[in-house]
């Protein structure tokens, strides 16, 4: 009888949900370890993007010194990364900087070089649900706007 109780106790500990959890109380220690590796990678990538964004801001301030009102609101890295070629990216950047009275060629070439080391962040910019063109961007925003 005591052996049966001991057997039940050992069996219940083995089947206990707390035993099925990995370190830190999360299910499966291997899964948690994999998640940490992913987080480290994402942090490094995000830091690189942040560095490029700071560089862009600094260079725009130099290029538009004395003409701050003409400075573009932003140069969206994800929009540039979505473009197929460097030529398209270059044209897009030139279009954004058309109001600048200073030479922008060096800035464009440096930015294109910095973009080569970056990857699009799918969570930061979602493609439009109506990418097939059935709705205008304004209609799409109105349809997907949160109440």
Swiss-Prot record:
The modification Phosphoserine is found at residues 26, 128, 134, 136. It comes from the Eukaryota. Pfam families: PP1_inhibitor. The keyword Phosphoprotein applies. Residues 127-137 have a biased composition (Polar residues). Residues 35-120 are annotated as: Inhibitory. Isoform 1 is detected in aorta and testis. Isoform 2 is detected in aorta. Residues 1-11 have a biased composition (Basic residues). It is found in: Cytoplasm. GO terms for biological process: cellular response to xenobiotic stimulus. One of its GO terms (cellular component) is cytosol. Its main location: cytoplasm. Residues 1-37, 118-147 are annotated as: Disordered. The modification Phosphothreonine is found at residue 38. GO terms for molecular function: protein serine/threonine phosphatase inhibitor activity. The keyword Iron does not apply. Belongs to the PP1 inhibitor family. PANTHER family: PROTEIN PHOSPHATASE 1 INHIBITOR POTENTIATED BY PROTEIN KINASE C, PROTEIN PHOSPHATASE 1 REGULATORY SUBUNIT 14A. This is Protein phosphatase 1 regulatory subunit 14A. It comes from Homo sapiens. The gene is PPP1R14A.
């Amino acid at each position: 009888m005591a052996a049966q109780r001991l057997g039940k106790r050992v069996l219940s500990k083995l089947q206990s949900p707390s035993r099925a959890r990995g370190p830190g109380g999360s299910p499966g220690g291997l899964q948690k370890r994999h998640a940490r590796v992913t987080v480290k990678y994402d942090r490094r990538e995000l830091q690189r993007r942040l560095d490029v964004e700071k560089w862009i801001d600094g260079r725009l301030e130099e290029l538009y010194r004395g003409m701050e009102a003409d400075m573009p609101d932003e140069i969206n890295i994800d929009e540039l990364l979505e473009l197929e070629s460097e030529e398209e990216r270059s044209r897009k950047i030139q279009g954004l900087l058309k109001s600048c009275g200073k030479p922008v060629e060096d800035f464009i070439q440096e930015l294109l070089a910095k973009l080569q080391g970056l990857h699009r962040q799918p969570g930061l910019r979602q493609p439009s649900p109506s990418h097939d063109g059935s709705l205008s961007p304004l209609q799409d925003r109105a349809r997907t706007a949160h109440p």
